Amino acid sequence: MTVTDIASRTYNHGWRLDPIVRSLLDTDFYKLLMLQMIREFYPDQKVTFSVINRTKRVRLGDVIDEGELRAQLDHARTIRFTKKELIWLAGNTFYGKTHMFSPDFLAWLAHFRLPDYELHKADGQYELHFHGPWTHTTMWEIPALAIVNELRSRQAMKGQGRFALDVLFARAKAKLWAKVERLRRLEGLRLSDFGTRRRHGFLWQRWCVEAVKEGLGPSFTGTSNVLLAMDNDLEAIGTNAHELPMVAAALARDDDELRFAPYRILDQWRQTYAGNLLIALPDAFGTKAFLRDAPDWVADWTGFRPDSAPPIEAGEEIIAWWKSKGRDPKQKLLVFSDAMDVESIEQIHHRFSDRVRLSFGWGTNLTNDFVGCAPDGSVDLDPISLVCKVTSVDGQPAVKLSDNPEKATGDPAEIARYLRVFGDAGRVRTPVVV
């Protein structure tokens, strides 16, 4: 465990560049899992990722200095996987499996570097895009989000006094520990850290992970952050993301291919991985549509990660679907990770813990909850909803419908086409906070 006085480090910061990303392992585990599959099945696809600020009231172009942002992005492009990191990836056990990553893939990673970026301002917001092979642009998602979020945090803390910073972090620590004390009461809880992309900062995420590891003991099952998993001897947690069905759908040549696209890429996933990595993310084009058209073999997968539908409703719908397929929900796994916090974790746990295997991914509300902690009452450290999504594939626009229309992304004409193919059933508009 590394003990850092975060307040002192923040106050004394005076370096020309304090790198936000210092390792290519400072990313979510599922990025590496997906990357290995992408390289196998989609080595030549050109995919653009774009950073999107859904919290429009926060004008990031006015908050973050462009020179500082470019310096951090440029620094990230200089980083390579180290020998130590590659040896750990080669020799560690993930999800009970040794040699998760092939020697060929690890040899390729040894020469990996992040591709170039495109950055400019428009109407008080940054437009940040990453163009190139999917095998490279996919790896920008997490570091780009972490960089933007931490630069915003640093700006909000600039000029604060030594003791004001002490109070800020003391309040945030006490707030987190109060959550831990509540979560301890949940029998059989299984919870992991999913908070890298929208964290306050790396040092704070590390403190949170170490605190929850001590506070929850065996109930804390690991972290999605590969670097923190390696450094803290934790399980690296993660399966797959929306980018897989989004890319597969954008490559579809007609409506029939579009309708089947989510299952085609899941079939490729199951050719690559097995066991507890067979977790389906059903909401890219609507959960009801996914369950309606799903091949029978999807019911044999380990479980689902409901992401954008109201969690209780989504859980009930999936349990009913398993039963309709003759499967026992008690043998299946539900992973809840959308904007989870203590209250929602408690509610979901009480509702489902005796009916299905449960796991929780605790994200922004673990690693970036400074709401009400600033001594001056500022809201500049309140988290925002920042995402980095696929926006085009081989020149074709990419779409995400989501169970919540507020989270939909893509060209309006393409969204209309996708709605015609998948339908609008079950989509409910709710405010997006994080």
From Swiss-Prot:
Catalytic activity: nicotinate + 5-phospho-alpha-D-ribose 1-diphosphate + ATP + H2O = nicotinate beta-D-ribonucleotide + ADP + phosphate + diphosphate
Pfam families: NAPRTase, NAPRTase_N
GO MF term set: nicotinate phosphoribosyltransferase activity
SUPFAM superfamilies, per database record: Nicotinate/Quinolinate PRTase C-terminal domain-like, Nicotinate/Quinolinate PRTase N-terminal domain-like
Keywords: Ligase, Phosphoprotein, Pyridine nucleotide biosynthesis
Pathway of action: Cofactor biosynthesis; NAD(+) biosynthesis; nicotinate D-ribonucleotide from nicotinate: step 1/1
Modified sites of kind Phosphohistidine: 242
GO biological process: NAD biosynthetic process via the salvage pathway
GO cellular component assignments: cytosol
Processing after translation: Transiently phosphorylated on a His residue during the reaction cycle. Phosphorylation strongly increases the affinity for substrates and increases the rate of nicotinate D-ribonucleotide production. Dephosphorylation regenerates the low-affinity form of the enzyme, leading to product release.
Domain of life the protein comes from: Bacteria
Enzyme Commission (EC) number: 6.3.4.21
Coiled coil: none
InterPro entries: N/Namide_PRibTrfase, NAPRTase_N, Nic_PRibTrfase, Nic_PRibTrfase-Fam, Nicotinate_pribotase-like_C
Transport among keywords: no
Family designation: Belongs to the NAPRTase family.
Primary role: Catalyzes the synthesis of beta-nicotinate D-ribonucleotide from nicotinate and 5-phospho-D-ribose 1-phosphate at the expense of ATP.
Protein name, as recorded: Nicotinate phosphoribosyltransferase
Organism: Bradyrhizobium sp. (strain BTAi1 / ATCC BAA-1182)
Gene that specifies this protein: pncB
